Amino acid sequence: MALRGWRLFGLAGTILVYIGGILFLSFVSLQSPQQKRNHARGYGEFETLRNRDLGLLGKKPPLQWCTELRYMDSPPPSPKAYKLLQTFPVNDGHQKSSNGRELTALVSFPGSGNTWLRYLLQQSTGILTGSVYKDYGLLKSGFPAENVANSSVLVVKTHEWGPQAWAPYGKAILLVRDPEKAILAEFNRQSGGHVGFASPDRYRRTKGRYWTQFVKNKLWAWEQTNLSWAKNFTGDVKLVFYDDLVENVEGTLRSILKFLNFPVNDELLACALMRKEGIYRRKKRILQFDPYSPAMHTAIDEKRSEVYAALGRFRSH
């Protein structure tokens, strides 16, 4: 009798395991195609970005700095340090400087490498850079002085132009990038963030009308940003071409620091060069099509030639 009871118990257990297995397999097989596509998307064009910029569990790895970041009027860190430090929060209660130092704008059309240059300047000086904007993504990822626009920071990021935009500044660094590449970078930023990319179907939205109007509007803004600061701003202007920065990071940084009257620390500069890529420079991605129409290319070529000639840059590309 006892033996029969054990057999019934074992049979019942087997049936329960069998039913549980069927339910599990049914749940897996009913997963929607969209969910499966989302799960597998990392193996496509975004895989490199995801692996490079995101750590375990999809979180960004902490930025590493060559020394502690500080405001201009804060005491320097102890001499021990040019070891690599992780991003740290800056005290929000810090009393901003009123030291009378001339405020310097770091100006560019969006998509011209402003964030990357800010990163390089922070690495090579240990001094925070500010901004007229408050980008929460940057605020949490290495730029704790976002929305600080006074002389407590090394430079202040802006994309604005005109008398009101110029008024606070005594000097300006004007970062200029080829409009074809800058417009594309800005389109990618609006679609995919500071280091992401626009998907190909974004260019074809509304049968291409959105992209066509975007190029027209941004080409005009590119011209206005660069010419207004170069020709109408009454303070000293340091022209920096993005291509020159890419080709000669050290020389360009040295010339910028000289313009800022900021002493070069060779150890920090060497560390900055070692870590020059950071996470704020969008990696190249080769599109399988040309997003610019022949008419767009013609308009861009004409405007590039006009602006570059006005800036004293006489090569066409």
Swiss-Prot record:
Segments traversing the membrane: 8-28
Organism superkingdom: Eukaryota
Glycosylation sites: N150, N226, N232
Key words, A-Z: Glycoprotein, Membrane, Transmembrane, Transmembrane helix
Recorded topology in the membrane: Single-pass membrane protein
UniProt keyword NADP, yes or no: no
Any one GO CC term of the record: membrane
Main location (coarse class): membrane
An MF annotation (GO) of this entry: sulfotransferase activity
Protein name, entry field: WSCD family member AAEL009094
Organism: Aedes aegypti
